[in-house]
Amino acid sequence: MPFGEYPYTIDDKGRVVMPPPFREFVEDGMILTRGMEGCLYVFPLASWRRVEEQLEGLPLTDAESRAFVRFFYSGANKARLDNQSRVSVPQTLRTFAGLDGDVIVAGAPGRLELWNPGRWEEAINAVQHTPPKPDLLANFVA
């Protein structure tokens, strides 16, 4: 499972170097797509297959489910690391996530996240200053 956060830069062509601890995680290819809170999710192909199975199980008759699937799938792009361990992030995804210059590459269960540093700081601060739901804490420390 990938963990940690690494500050990097995204070049003018939309390429970001994958931090060394994360390279093996995505060496067989990856899917980049829109994530929550304005970041990008980066799934290794094996994890993406599990995500697809979960999304396919959502009810087609539910408007919220359809909207979420549309949001998630329409932004998805397949990618591989180049010979300099960079991943190319499409312009539409860079615009969505506000990635221009500095970027935070963060680990999460089953995926990586690419963040605009300002949004990353806001997201981390929000967690620090908002008590988690009691159910979440009970499961976390159990």
Swiss-Prot record:
Membrane-crossing segments per the record: none
Keyword terms, alphabetized: Cytoplasm, DNA-binding, Repeat, Transcription, Transcription regulation
GO cellular component: cytoplasm; nucleoid
Keyword check for Repeat: yes
GO BP terms in the entry: negative regulation of DNA-templated transcription initiation
Compartments (UniProt record): Cytoplasm, Nucleoid
Domain SpoVT-AbrB: 5-47, 76-119
GO molecular function term, any single one: DNA-binding transcription factor activity
Pfam families linked to this entry: MraZ
Binding partners and assembly: Forms oligomers.
Family: Belongs to the MraZ family.
The name this protein goes by in its record: Transcriptional regulator MraZ
Lineage, broadest ranks: Bacteria, Thermotogati, Deinococcota, Deinococci, Deinococcales
